[in-house]
């Protein structure tokens, strides 16, 4: 009897733990069981236990109901993303009851605490006075993500503060760092990436800092290279510094004319003016320095006078290699700027004209600039009677490189019938977007040599992407053309691949035709 009672109690307990849907089925099954039991009297077990006996057969189904496999996982991920979007600006959201069960991974559950007051045991007042934002935090999560936070909350000198003020970090950058720590997600934007890098460096979050540097290297251009150079030195990022110098050297005139150049500090200004490899006319360097001086006067609340411009430039003025300017540039530009003293102007004029040159404080040796490299894609060239005429049609080829380079121009063939003049329109495109073009004339001497035709400014080329090089030539004479073209050419440390272009309407392709050379800086 005791054994029967224990069995009955166990069955009843199991039944009470079942979902309602299973209980309902149990009742129906019990009725059938009672009917058969009364008629045959073959079973002495309580009717309710009939369903318990089949519980093992339903175990898989119940587990599937409790732990769905595919659909809930997607919806969970979607809801987490939606929650993140809301939580960037709203930190007072209260999760649904039993929210832990909605997210299968610790990463997703941890992400629910991002910018959330729930269980927060510390708050940060982030940003400068007048632009602060109060953000919640959880000491354990922060300490796991940053050694600085660990020392702050659990170290020997830890202070038990409920509120911590951080005036030197922008709220958006601090949130980006918190999102990485809580959610293991990197969310960077062009307007906040530098501030995020500062935060990642300050709180020693190295993987986020590396992601910021990669983002900056990818978005590096002549427009922002000078500012990023200044910041890379501040953050002690030598790789980023080197990338900045590569852009500034190759696209010096674009970089010097950019608005960002005027935002650099004095130390960076000196570094750029001292640079031996700048590919720029010295008059452009001079004008850029004056533009910087004007903005610096505004930063120092000084009147925009010639005296103050010279004052803020200081000794950096003598890093400009004024004696190396073309005489016309000096006479019409620097000499009339008012920045030079009368004695300096007279001495520089004498430097240009006199046999006995005066001593100058300015550097009188021209910059070396960068030496252009040439990628020649044909193994031979030829000419045949009535073989290659232009007639205003387009010769085009596509190419890709494995390292960032700067295309300065193309090397083109000339006349095979003696000296001749050609009009050339050169163009460089990426996915149909024109990146650079120029219209110029060049003379050929009848030889099979190539003749350079330059873009106004070198064009930055990113690796592993095909670009289209095109030229439309206008000339009456027959021209040389290339033969035995190569699909891949090694030029120093740069590998260049070639393929045919659909823009080519004059016969140029990989195996033969025109545009024999790419001229570039690397």
From Swiss-Prot:
Q: Which GO terms describe its molecular function?
A: identical protein binding
Limits of the BACK domain:
235-300
Domain of life of the organism encoding this protein: Eukaryota
The entry's keywords: Cytoplasm, Neurogenesis, Nucleus
> Segment Disordered: which positions?
25-44
**Gene Ontology cellular component list:** cytosol; nucleus
**GO biological process terms on file:** cerebral cortex development; dendrite morphogenesis; neurogenesis
Q: Where is the composition biased (Low complexity)?
A: 32-44
- Compartment(s) where it occurs, according to its Swiss-Prot or TrEMBL record: Cytoplasm, Cytosol; Nucleus
This protein is called: BTB/POZ domain-containing protein 3
| Organism name | Homo sapiens (Human)
The organism that produces this protein has a lineage beginning with: Eukaryota, Metazoa, Chordata, Craniata, Vertebrata
The coding gene here is BTBD3
